[in-house]
UniProtKB/Swiss-Prot annotation:
Subcellular location, record wording: Cytoplasm
GO cellular component: cytosol
UniProt name for this protein: Protein RecA
GO MF terms, alphabetically ordered: ATP binding; ATP hydrolysis activity; ATP-dependent DNA damage sensor activity; damaged DNA binding; single-stranded DNA binding
PANTHER family linked to this entry: MITOCHONDRIAL DNA REPAIR PROTEIN RECA HOMOLOG-RELATED (PTHR45900:SF1), RECA (PTHR45900)
SUPFAM superfamilies from the UniProt entry: P-loop containing nucleoside triphosphate hydrolases (SSF52540), RecA protein, C-terminal domain (SSF54752)
Organism encoding this protein: Streptococcus thermophilus (strain CNRZ 1066)
Family: Belongs to the RecA family.
Gene behind this protein: recA
Residues annotated as binding ATP: 79-86
Length: 384
């Protein structure tokens, strides 16, 4: 007879031998029928921390709380037209490829610009692209890619463009009430388990619609029914704000726009946080710009007047020059980025970080002990 563990003894004491034996028999039968791990005690799971992949934006990683998009979950990105939804998704594609993963893009809108994707860092030669003829076909392709377990990220652009086959075959003007909602509901039921099992990140881009006759409250809604809202672990609301003017010869031109990304739903961290990013036309999210702003706000980059400094060395007069310096020095960019992530608890401390902290603490202890020795000497002299 196997030796009882402390946990087993506690369960036996609480529930009794007969009930525990019945439970063990049931668990063995379930494991036999459905495989190992079909049912387990939550504390026995080897991996309890949610794995994440960076979104490609430092500000968004901080807003998400966990440091990026959770693996094995469904993400919805929605917002008005030209707000930057596809740009945010393409940065996730580029980040996936940067980390050695495989990404797929289901282009239901038939509007993906390869040149723009390449400018954002996407390796278009390695990107899997599908332009389906119908919504069912697009979701089936996404399902097969996810089931393979070889794809790390699947992006569907967009839910509104996933037109059911019956609507395509019908005439314009025919009523097709609830067809798309039923299609999405069925797809979510089929895909959610496979997404979790394969640890694939599924990003669904969605558009906005307005409800008719709404006098009070928010009239905005997203097409495709409510299933995606329920199954999504993270929902991002992307809104373009003010235009960004250029400098020098381009001072009268709009070169980008400030964009607000609000985390309206988050199952892995506290929701309702906001990220403010600069989306530059033709370039995507300004990663150097957000790093300069965030690092200077928390004191990693020092700012005195118009000058920005790091580790006592001036890196530029004005934010534009500071951004250019970081773009020209990727090793400094990576070092500051790591320190910011450590500050917000998005990554674990490296050995170098721990050593630096330990050295500071040791110095403080030595200084304190010297002061104590001096105080004791003074006391002895007074007593003498």
């Amino acid at each position: 007879m196997a030796k009882k563990t402390k946990k087993t003894e506690e369960i036996t004491k609480k529930f009794g031998d007969e009930r525990l034996k019945a439970l063990d028999d049931a668990l063995k039968n379930i494991e036999k029928d459905f495989g190992k791990g079909a049912v387990m005690r939550l504390g026995e799971r080897a991996e309890q921390k949610v794995q994440v992949m960076s979104s490609g934006s430092l500000a968004l990683d901080i807003a998400l709380g966990a440091g990026g998009y959770p693996k094995g979950r469904i993400i919805e990105i929605y917002g008005p037209e030209s707000s930057g939804k596809t740009t945010v998704a393409l940065h996730a594609v580029a980040q996936t490829q940067k980390e050695g993963g495989i990404a797929a893009f289901i282009d239901a809108e038939h509007a993906l610009d390869p040149a723009y994707a390449a400018a954002l860092g996407v390796n278009i030669d390695e990107l899997l692209l599908s332009q389906p003829d119908s919504g069912e076909q697009g979701l089936e392709i996404a399902g097969k890619l996810i089931d393979s377990g070889a794809v790390d990220l699947v992006v569907v652009d967009s839910v509104a463009a996933l037109v059911p086959r019956a609507e395509i075959d019908g005439d314009i003007g025919d009523s097709h009430v609830g067809l798309q909602a039923r299609m999405m509901s069925q797809a979510m039921r089929k895909l959610s388990a496979s997404i979790n099992k394969t640890k694939t990140i599924a990003i669904f881009i969605n558009q906005l619609r307005e409800k008719v006759g709404i006098m009070f409250g928010n009239p905005e809604t997203t097409p495709g029914g409510r299933a995606l809202k329920f199954y999504a672990s993270v929902r991002l609301d992307v809104r373009g704000n003010t235009q960004i003017k250029g400098t020098g010869d381009k001072k009268d031109q709009n070169v980008g726009k400030e964009t607000k990304i609000k985390v309206v739903k988050n199952k892995v961290a506290p929701p309702f946080k906001e990220a403010f990013v600069e989306i530059m036309y033709g370039e995507g999210i300004s990663q150097t710009g957000e790093l300069v702003k965030i690092a200077s706000d928390i004191g990693i980059i020092q700012k005195a007047g118009a000058w920005f400094s790091y580790n006592g060395e001036k890196i530029g007069q004005g934010s534009e020059n500071a951004k250019k310096y970081l773009a020209d020095h990727p090793e400094i960019f990576a070092e500051i980025d790591h320190k910011v992530r450590v500050h917000y608890g998005l990554v674990e401390l490296d050995e170098d970080d721990v050593v630096e902290d330990t050295q500071v603490e040791d110095t403080q202890v030595e200084d304190t002990s010297d002061e104590l020795i001096l105080d004791l000497d003074s006391t002895i002299e007074i007593e003498e």
